[in-house]
Structure formats: C-alpha cells, structure tokens
Curated annotation (Swiss-Prot):
Annotated binding of Zn(2+) 2, by residue: C704, C707, C734, C737
Residues engaged in binding Zn(2+) 1: C688, C691, C712, C715
Database matches in PROSITE patterns: ZF_FYVE
Originating gene: adcD
Short name of one Pfam family: FYVE
Annotated protein name in UniProt: Arrestin domain-containing protein D
Zinc finger regions, FYVE-type: 682-742
Keywords: Metal-binding, Zinc, Zinc-finger
Biased composition (Basic residues): 466-478
Top-level division of the source organism's lineage: Eukaryota
Source species of the chain: Dictyostelium discoideum (Social amoeba)
Family: Belongs to the arrestin family.
Sequence ranges of Low complexity compositional bias: 173-205, 435-450, 608-633
Amino acid sequence: MTTLLNNHHNNNSLPIQISQQHVLINSNQNESNQPSSLFNSISPQKKLSPTLNSTSIPPPPPSSSSKYPLELSEKGQICNLKINLDKSYFTNGETISGKVNILLTERQCIKRVKLQLCGYEKIFQHAQHSNNTYQTFKFYSGNLNIPPLNVNIETTSLNSLPISNSENNSPILLPTTTSTQNSTLSPTLLSSNLNSKSSTTTTTTTGMMSSVSSLSSSFSQQLTTPIHEFESGVYEYPFSFQLPKYLAPSLNYIGYLSIFYLVHCKVDYSKGREWKDQKVMKSSELWISGINKQYQDYLLYNKTHFTSHKLAHYLNWLSFGTNTNSNNSNNNNNNNNNNNNNNNNNNNNNNNNNNNNNNQPSTITNNNINNNNNIGISNNYKSNPIEMAICLRENNCYIGSKATFFIQLKNPLNLKINSIRVELFQQISFIKTLSNSNSSSSGGSSNKNNNGGGIGNDRISNIQKSNKKSSGSHRYHYRNNSSDHNIDKTKVSQTQILLHNYDCRELFKNQTTTSSSSSQEILCSTNLQILIPFKIEDDQVFPTTRGFLSTVKHFFIISIPSISNFKLKIPVHLWQRFDDNNFTTISNNIHSLPFHTSNSFGNIRNSYSSSGSGSGSGSSNSNSNHSSSNYLNEQEENLDEQQQQNYDDEFYDDEDDEDNDRFKLNPPKEWKVLWLPKWKDESSITNCNLCDNTFTIIRRTHHCRACGGVFCEACSNQKVCLYGFGVNNKVRICLMCFDAVKAESSNSIYGSNINSSILPFKNGLPLQNVFSKKKVYKPPYLVHL
C-alpha cells in the first residue's frame, strides 16, 4: 500500500480544480451571527447507511467512524470550516470532487489548507478477549495541499454580509496574470507563477534541492505579505481526489469488522503573520463501493448462470415419523437392548440391533413398521434413499433482490414432509494478530510504523494462502521470519440472517410420475423465492495491509426439519447494487430499490436495470460522471425482440392459471439432475456381476451405490463419496466404478476435463462427474473486460 501511495504522489494523480484565480477582499468585522447562520444553511443533507433499512431492523450506529469526531472546533471560533462533497457514494477509480467552505468572522491570515483522504479499518477483538474491544488501523492515506490563493468566492454569501465601511463597498481583486486567470492549475504550477512575480531573491542551489528551496521560500515569502490576510466572508476552495482502483469497500459488520473512509480538512490561520498559529479541523464521511462497474454490467447481461446442488440421504428407519413415534421406537429399542444383556439366547430382540448395520441391507420386522404408522416404509428402505436437487437460478445475488430456488424431491418411501426450512448465514473468518511477545521478537523496528500494533507491511508479504481446504473454507497461514511454527489460526464468526419455513403441503401439490422399467417413482418439484434483507452486507471484502486478513462468505442452508441431518449448503455471491441513477434512492429511500416482486416479473433485464421510484431532485448525490448506465440502456434497446422473448420464456410460462395469477417459474433447460441408480433385485441374481462367483452363506451380496449392481465382498470393498449424486459420506462401490474414480482424478481435479469415453455406462447413466468434488466458486473482485 505504501508503494501505491508513492506512485500517486509522483504522478500527481490528486489534482486540484480551480475555476477562478482571484481573491475578493471585503472589510467585514462586525455582526458575526448572520454569516454563521448563513453558513450552516448550506450544510449537506445527513447521510444514511447504504444498506440498512430503518423500518425492518433496529437503527444502526450513526457512523462506523464514531471514534473520529467530524469536527474539532469550539463555539464562537473565528474560523469555521465545512466540507461539501458532490455526492456520498463512489466507486473504485472514480474522482472525488467537492468544495471546502471557510467562514471568517474577523480579519485573519490563512496560512495553509490541507486535505487528507484516509481509509480506516476497525477490528473488534472479541475473538481474543472476553470484552468487546477494538483496534482501528489506517490502511490508506492521500494528501493534498491547497494554496490559500486558489479560492473561488461565493458572491451570494458575501452580498448578504454586513459592510461596516461605505468606502469599501466594491470588492478588491488581486492582480493576476492572463495565463492564470480562469484556468485550472496544480499547486506546483501556481507556486511557480507566484515565484516568478515575487520581488525577493532566493538562494540558488543545484539539483532538486534548488526547486524545493525556491518553492518553500516563495510560500514563506507570500505568507508574510498582506495579500494572505483575508477579510470576513465565506471562501470556497474546490478540490478533487483520484481514487485508486483497488480499495476495500465501505462496510459495517456491527460488532465484527468495519471499513470506513473520511476526508479530513485542516486550516492553519492566525491573527497576523507573527501571531500564534491556530488550527481548525473538519471531516466528512463517504462510502466507496468495491464492485467494479464493468463487472456489474457484465453480471446484468449474464444473469442466467445458475448453480445446482444435490443431496442424497440413506435413511435409517429409526429417524422416521413424528417425535412421539420416534420416542416410542427409541424406548422399544432400549428395552430390547436391556433384554439382550439379560438374555443372550433371545434372537427376536436382536433383530432391531441388526437394522443399524450400514454394511449390508436388512429387513424391517412388522413390529417395527407398526411403530411408524404414519409413514409407509418398504422393506428395501436402504435401496430407496430420499434425494433432493436444488438449483439456484442466479449465483450472483444482490441485496434487496430475490433469490430463486428450484427444488426437486424424490421421495420413494412416501415420507410425510410438512415444511422446508430456508436459512441465510453470514460467515466472517478472521486471522488473529500476533501477540506482543511475537511482534517484539521479530522486526521490532517495523512495528513502530503500525498504528496500534498489528501486522506490518514487511510481514504481509510472508502471508501465504494454503491450497489445502478444511471444512470447505480456505485457511491462511502466517510464516514468521524467525520461526515457521508460529501459525495464526482462523477465527470464524457465523451469524444467521433470516429463517423461513415454507409449507410443503401447498408447494408439492403438483407431483409428476416418472416411469421406469421396474416401477414408478414419484418426483415432486416446486420453486421458492427468498428476499435478501437490507441489514446484510455484501461479501466483496478486500484484504488490507493492517490488522486482520478477513473473508466474508454468505450461504443458504435448505433443510427438511422432519428428517434429521438432511441439510444442503448452497454458497452464494452477494453484491451491493450501486447504479448511477440509484445513489439518491439508496441513501434517501432504501426500501424503493428495484427487485423482483411476486406479481410483476416481466422483463428480467429491465427489472434489474431500472432506477427505482425514488426521485433524485434536490440532492447532491445524483451527480455522476459515469456513462455505464447509458451504455447499458443503449445495449438493451439494440437487443433483438425474438432473443428477448426466448430469454424470458426460458424461465417464465405465460399460460393462464386459474389458481395462480402470477407467472409460473420454470427451471433452466440446462439443469439436468443425476439421480441415484435403481438397485438390482438380488433375489434373481445368484452370481457376482464381476467375478461370477456364486453367492453362498459366507459369500454374501452387496450393492454398488454408483451403478446399482450386485457384487460380492471382494469386488465391492472400496468406499468413496459420490458428490455428483449428492452423497457426501463414503459408501460402497464396485471395483469398476473405483477405476473410474482413479481415471477421473488423474485427468482433472474437479473432473471437468475428463473424457467421458473412458467411463463405464451402467443402467443408461454415465458416471462422468459423479465422483468429482463440488467446485468452490470464488467471486472475482475485479474483472477487466
């Protein structure tokens, strides 16, 4: 980050924009109350948090920068200061422009006007300590010095000021040259012009020190002349900052992590040139979006990318039924276990214990079936697992929009399912800072530059990301210069954002029956829409150079409460919407953000590119220099009507429905569900399908979960996870399927580039991507098109 700041300094990427190069001097020394009230009347409107809705959640803290007061001044001060930004929300790489207004109630000498754009990271230490303390680090800083001569007068404010002396009614303009009049000058160019006009001589040196000394002497000489003494009035200084393209977005995870940006302005002034210097400081907060506009436009045109997940569960009959029935069955099992301990020769009671054996299929007695009267359980319950396939239509979701799920449920045992539970979680992973002992033992000199401790810039380069994965999440390892055993562990904080239970009796009203060679299977399908609340933040978090390295992830968990351990985790990439036309809507009317409604689907692209119903009149946030929205609208008009109609028909059905007035949602056509194969009937098979040995009392039958064939113990002794089928636990497969696993792993890690010709086909189902692990998608932080 230090290198980035130096590059900005050398390239003069922080220009100052000046509209007029003259100073108006007006003699006003009395009646300071009227200018003060007028100065307060032009204060900008109070800014709101861009992602928090005050109508749905408790009010958030006023600002994430509460530790830094926005004004350091006293009442009745001679010099008052105010910062007015053109707007409050910016994107990476954008120019921040605004004005600094200085109110002088008496004649003063302004010596320096300094601006500083700073980025802060507030990290809470509750993961390390019992109390909820925090540390604040400054990870970005950009400075800009404005010469006092670069002023643009607000004539409307000066005309209303009282004038004590009638002889000074006309303003006095400072003499300026033709080259500097009404032009935009940098502070260096203005200083050189002033140096050429000054009558004083400077000491001549060689090299760079000559120019530096001449500039400093010219500034010091100009400060000693009466030209820098300003009369009472309101003085306006325009400025502009150029943001870098890789800044962390503004966020406020309350109680965990906060990133905020402030524009500080400090003015040094005095009564005279030899009087004691005084200073006044004022700050203004702004919000920066981490989403690149090009990538956001890219998402608008590529919204049809979906992600699908599948879960298969080999059920145990003890987990079926209601709570009462399950308790009765557990009591019966406990009684049977006690009888087994007392009577070792009682074979009838041992039948229940054999049902828990996962290595081979078993049958259920009539007594056990009677304990679950509400559920029809077949004898081959192990060969008919319950399966659920879920398709998330859009992997990239926006805050305030709806996430659409398509669900297909295969229930061969006709289990009674009353509801489906949908949960949204936010997971924040932290890296602990080094302890004081470790920090002082290595690189003690570098720690002095850190604000409040933490990891220095020289140590950040030693942080390496491990390729290994643990529980689906990445781990970051810190390697110390002196010891490789000092590795910081990841601290994870998981918060539940929303919880909804949907009634399945209405959702699964329409059931489709798929016929096969042996039997008919019932397949239930439905769709759900979940509105992502505004109280959540996006997951586009950038690692900073101070404090912790943090990652934020969001995921859905869809489960069936009546079935234990039947949960499916679906990761989602969450984005904050920052359209050019919606800056005012986001800040002033949060609940009017554009999102899908249940009764108005229509054109998908238009619903995502609309500017909302909020009006942007009378607000400074409506100004924008971007043309990406105009480009998006032009591209939208050029789309072919036939392609647009085909795009809409892919997900929506316009057929009339008396029971439902809204449009029907259709799953993507590319979504193909790979269900588990049907087990072969072992009663009609006497030999192993691979070695052709005859089954006996010792050589028992086993089924392959990947192909459904019947094999002996020697030909089906391998166990793997069938991720393509949704089986996350290791199950038994045959040797032929195991060879396909090895062939797939040798070609590709995720199995995406494997040749399907080398994989066997069994029961008409290819085994491609069956054993491959689900790919973990990571949202790109910045995409160059």
